[in-house]
Regions:
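Core RecA-like ATPase module of SF1/SF2 helicases and allied nucleic-acid translocases
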Residues: 1-7, 15-17, 23, 38, ...
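A structural preference for long, well-packed, hydrophobic secondary-structure segments
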Residues: 14-16, 30-31
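Glycine-rich phosphate-binding "P-loop"
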Residues: 22-46
Length: 163
């Protein structure tokens, strides 16, 4: 279901060598580092492709609910000035959510498990290389069908991430 580039990247994250992949090619996985979540969200706005003749779904996937809360608030605020329909096409998927919409979804890796999106933007702290964070990156990466952006972030609102 994923492109070769996304599946190979996810297998590398999980330490799975030489798995035979379906030959559906796409855009290479994009890796980038940002100072904070706000800078990452600005970059996401530049790359998101939703609309006619583009993708139907995109996800911004974070490590924790606290990080997803901040990312969702920033993204929604930035989208409001663009004419994007945040009422019907923006979804913050959290543990109390009762519905899912096409468009942009912001969530955590553990709530994204089992879902698929055309574009996925993964935003995790650079410092966190724990086993759980590695598993989270793998889960998030495998949600992408066509394009995957792996973003690492150094700080949240001027405070360094906790590991």
């Amino acid at each position: 279901r994923n492109t070769v580039e996304i599946a190979a990247y996810a297998n590398k994250l999980a330490g799975i060598p030489d798995m035979e992949l379906l030959q559906r090619h796409g855009k290479p996985v994009q890796e980038q580092q940002f100072e904070d979540i706000q800078a990452a969200v600005k970059a996401i706005l530049d790359c998101i492709k939703l609309g006619e003749d583009e993708f139907e779904t995109a996800a911004v996937i974070f490590r924790t609910e606290k990080e997803a809360d901040l990312g969702a608030a920033l993204l929604k605020k930035m989208l409001e000035g663009t004419g994007f329909d945040t009422k019907d096409r923006f979804n913050y998927l959290h543990r109390n959510s009762s519905r899912f919409k096409k468009g942009i979804t912001v969530t955590t890796f553990y709530l994204a498990k089992g879902l698929e999106f055309d574009q996925v933007f993964v935003v995790f702290p650079e410092k966190d290389q724990s086993a759980l964070a590695k598993q989270g990156r793998y889960i998030a990466a495998t949600r992408a069908l066509h394009e995957l952006y792996m973003y690492s972030v150094l700080t949240v609102s001027g405070k360094h991430f906790d590991s």
